[in-house]
Design a protein with these regions (language model features):
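Conserved ABC ATPase "signature" region
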Residues: 70, 74, 81-99
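Catalytic Walker B motif of ABC-type/P-loop ATPase nucleotide-binding domains
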Residues: 128-131
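Conserved ABC transporter NBD signature motif
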Residues: 30-41, 46
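Walker A (P-loop) phosphate-binding loop of ABC-type ATPase nucleotide-binding domains
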Residues: 9-13
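Conserved catalytic motifs of ABC-family nucleotide-binding domains
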Residues: 124
Length: 285
């Protein structure tokens, strides 16, 4: 019932990790377990527990949506009646019932991804590998996919997510690891990773020059913003440190007109640990 996100630059090895853990290829060395089973010695048991959906859809365009689903039910040995019931349930859950009789070539990109994910769920896996599941989707389709992932997590499914979208990891992941040149270079929750990076600060805006000067004299490391009644004060953004700062200003009878916080985001983390901007940040630049 959690989401583990693997981030990394192109070529870092994210898809290779997914292929090893899903038993599609064998590792050169080392050990790994999925759902308690060794991926080398217990590959069949691993496959029985997992589902995999990648950035390139496994949907067959020569079959209708429902036929694609029934094909997966057959591969999972569900039996005709049980398989049909499971297919109906998933088509309804992913809002595909009305399109079930159509060929996937007539689907939108978001619909194809939902069909691909629904096919993965036919066998009720306990662990699902999502390899860049929202690449190429428009913002609305991405949000719809996020909602589907949250629903899976709420039902107890564990998600292993690779993504090039840092906001996606920030939004969905309980734990994040950053992979670079085949090695984990950072790991933790989004908040833990952000706190490792210096640069967090509070921005304090004052109504008068007198208040600005009093605060500047009181607060260690405070820096003025040229031409404005604004101070920037180093701060980790925690509630405790914010309370201490406000108490100090209150004791000095200094009134703050406006306050805002800035903490490093995952782009800052990514750049700090890999030496490169994320794919998303590079595209924006």
């Amino acid at each position: 019932g959690t989401v583990f996100a693997l981030l990394g630059p192109n070529g870092a090895g994210k898809t290779t990790v997914v292929r090893i853990l899903s038993t599609l290829i064998r590792a050169d060395a080392g050990e790994a377990r999925v759902a308690g089973h060794d991926v080398r010695a217990g590959a069949d048991r691993v496959r029985a527990e997992i589902g995999v959906t990648g950035q390139f859809s496994a949907v067959d365009d020569l079959l209708t949506g429902a036929e694609n689903m029934m094909l997966m039910a057959g591969l999972r040995h569900l039996g005709r009646e049980a398989g049909a019931a499971r297919v109906r349930e998933l088509l309804e859950r992913f809002d595909l019932a009305q399109a079930a009789g159509r060929l996937p070539s007539t689907y939108s990109g978001g619909m194809r991804r939902r069909l691909d994910l629904a096919m993965t769920l036919v066998g009720s896996p306990s662990v699902i590998f999502l390899d860049e599941p929202t690449t190429g989707l428009d913002p609305r389709s991405r949000r719809t996919m996020w909602d589907s992932i949250r629903a899976l997590v709420a039902s107890g499914v564990t998600i292993f997510l690779t993504t090039q979208y840092l906001d996606e990891a920030d939004e969905l992941a309980d734990q994040i690891a950053v992979l670079d040149h085949g090695r984990i270079v950072a790991q933790g929750s989004a908040d833990q990773l952000k706190q490792r990076i210096p640069g967090g600060h509070l921005q304090l805006e004052f109504a008068t020059v007198q208040a600005l000067e009093l605060a500047s004299a009181m607060l260690d490391g405070a820096a003025r913003e040229d031409g404005k009644l604004i101070l920037r004060v180093p701060n980790d953004g925690s509630v405790a440190s914010l309370r201490r700062l406000l108490a100090e200003l209150d004791e000095g009878s200094v009134e703050v007109e406006r306050l805002s916080t800035h903490t490093p985001d995952l782009d800052d983390v990514f750049f700090a640990v890999t030496g490169r901007p994320s794919t998303e940040a590079a595209a924006a630049a």
